[in-house]
């Protein structure tokens, strides 16, 4: 990331919190800039840490992988994608048939608690823990 200093009045505070959500500092470098790491490298690196990486708010007209690249290629290795408006899923699948192979998630994209909306989607996992959620997300649509 380029060493650009954050302007909290413009971009908001970038707080560093401990495991108990206590604020322990602030990140001074602006984190919303582009990185020099390719998408495929990010996906692979996240997988090395047993995480999952997926493109967010792909239905948005700006700052989304679809608005920037025009497509989501199988090459990236995504197993799911997130859309803001779950009602747009069928429309997106028609324009981008590859999406039918992915699990589609939807959330509020809220950056503040007061902006969160009522959930439009619930995932069904056998246990209430992170491993069950990651197992669910790591399976492509149609996998058992």
Locate the predicted segments by residue.
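Amphipathic coiled-coil/heptad-repeat helices and related helical stalk/stem segments
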Residues: 35-39, 65
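Surface-exposed cleft-lining segments at the edges of enzyme active sites
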Residues: 23-35
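Charged catalytic cores and adjacent phosphate/nucleic-acid-binding surfaces used
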Residues: 1-6, 13-19, 30-31, 44, ...
């Amino acid at each position: 990331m380029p060493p650009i200093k954050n302007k909290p009045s413009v971009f908001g505070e970038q707080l560093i919190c401990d495991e108990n959500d206590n604020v322990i500092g602030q990140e001074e470098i602006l984190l919303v800039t582009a990185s020099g790491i390719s998408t495929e490298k990010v996906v692979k690196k996240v997988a090395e840490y047993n995480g999952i990486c997926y493109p967010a708010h792909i239905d948005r007209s700006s700052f989304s992988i679809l608005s920037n690249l025009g497509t989501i290629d199988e090459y990236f290795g995504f197993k799911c994608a997130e859309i803001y408006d779950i009602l747009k899923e069928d429309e997106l699948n028609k324009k981008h048939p590859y999406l039918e192979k992915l699990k589609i998630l939807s959330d509020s994209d809220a950056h503040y608690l007061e902006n969160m909306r009522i959930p439009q989607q619930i995932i069904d996992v056998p246990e209430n823990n992170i491993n069950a959620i990651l197992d669910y997300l790591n399976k492509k649509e149609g996998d058992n």
